[in-house]
């Protein structure tokens, strides 16, 4: 590909014209490069002969008068009188320019002349009194550096004696800054050459320098023209010019290193001891040559197969010979190498030990950045952090990235950065699987979902059946929470009134060790159906809410208020009655109270053998579609949206006799037991009902008591009132007058 090179204008425009374009061509430099590398030895020998001849001629040549040519330089002098090297106008078509005829004949160049048409018959002297360069191997100059370029980059294979003489004339003072004082500004950068730079500056392409700075210094016309376009087109790294000696040095060093490595490997292979041959190997060694001679096969695998077949065809007597030989081989081997073991030939064990050592050393440093899977492996998942077990982000890795140490207190972080303790991580698992914060206590889950208690499996938050949020640790307190109970264990009995009015009757028990039982019944507007849920107030089945240690003032009113707040959204609808219990042992519906005389209203006798078991009752509640069945606080459950009913407003109930209300409540309980198929003694229930009526007649004889009995009906809340306690252990019925806005659901609070 032809390269065009435009001449650069210099400060002295009168020296030459600046409109000339030189075109150079690259011709087959790759092929000639191989030839030149083969001819290097011949060229080096001939160059030594030429150098000796040029030294002799250099001493004979006289110095002309214009020795101070660099200090008193004529402005029209071409190229600082360096035209003896190359004319600034070397034409591509071979037009005449100035070199001496003798020199041109020797190197095959057409004679050329300088600008003033004065042929340089005699070369200039060694400048500034410095003797000519002696290109001798003793000077430390490497001889291959005379030919740094490939043979294809210049058409002439080697320097003649005269051109070698030209190379010997120029000393480093040629390029000194003091030599170019007059015609060029001092700001022009000038390179001074060293002895190591000199050989490649005078290359066979006749370039004094390939560097751009000295390139401008030597010639005002942008370059002393060379044949290679690669030399013209940019600054070349000196390492490329010196590539022959440096490559040789690199080869020597690489060869030395390879030899050393081979020696070390040989040293390692020397102690390798082969294990003794067994019987079959001895047979193969003996018979292999015969099989190869008989068969034309050359593959060793096929030969081994043939030998194996023949070995199995041998009789025991023939094989025993080889077994005897193998035994002798082993004995000889043991005598030669007493401490030898076959494990020495296999480096797996040593490699394994090495890996373990490397791991132990890197554990202190780089292994902290690894995740638990990479650090401990799949076999030790117990040591993984909790997020790694869930295939989440490793907290140890994240803490190592953040510069913090690994969490040592056993706590970990979830995806959102909230810290989880070890106690909360199981709950965290359940919440991630679909549980909610409003669901029941998940630590004591019942495995059979059909036998789950009503506290855990109620689908609708708006259902009256079963008091759907008995154990929900939500903002509104549940009935079964210890916060809602007095310190003295009181039995709370909830009866449904005829129009969704709830009556809370509290009876003080003499012994605080008895477990309080909560019986909750709820019925529809007709009062025909109701559901019963007995929940023992134990620490394992109730929500972990802070328990009240002492009896508080107005505790019954607070219970009523919480109950009213809990069922403030009962206008949504009712689900089918569900009977559930959280206890499997038989407990009476109502505990017998021995102190009947101290009971303010009544004490219900126990109903015998009435244990309620969930397994005997059909689970009529269905799980809502698209919502978690345990999520009782979900306002968009299916039952709530599809079973919306309009309830009749409950008017204010003013009953002067509590006998009828309690009787209706007891009747509804018996009715509910009969409808749902409880195996209870109905005659016992009837007798208990008669006993209840008798007690009510005795209690309602006092007119003062009956006048003070009032029913408080509220829609969304029951106002708190003070709890009056008398010294004779008889509780006084306290109630508040109803609010003007109370309409829907009534709650009767009696303590």
Swiss-Prot record:
Motif (Nuclear localization signal): 351-357
PROSITE patterns associated with the record: HMG_BOX_2
Compositionally biased region (Basic and acidic residues): 54-66
GO biological process: canonical Wnt signaling pathway; embryonic pattern specification; heart development; imaginal disc-derived wing morphogenesis; mesodermal cell fate determination; negative regulation of DNA-templated transcription; positive regulation of DNA-templated transcription; positive regulation of gene expression
Name of the protein in question: Protein pangolin, isoforms A/H/I/S
Organism: Drosophila melanogaster (Fruit fly)
Gene from which the chain derives: pan
Cellular localization per UniProt: Nucleus
Effect of disrupting the coding gene: Flies exhibit a segment polarity phenotype and altered expression of the wg target genes en and Ubx.
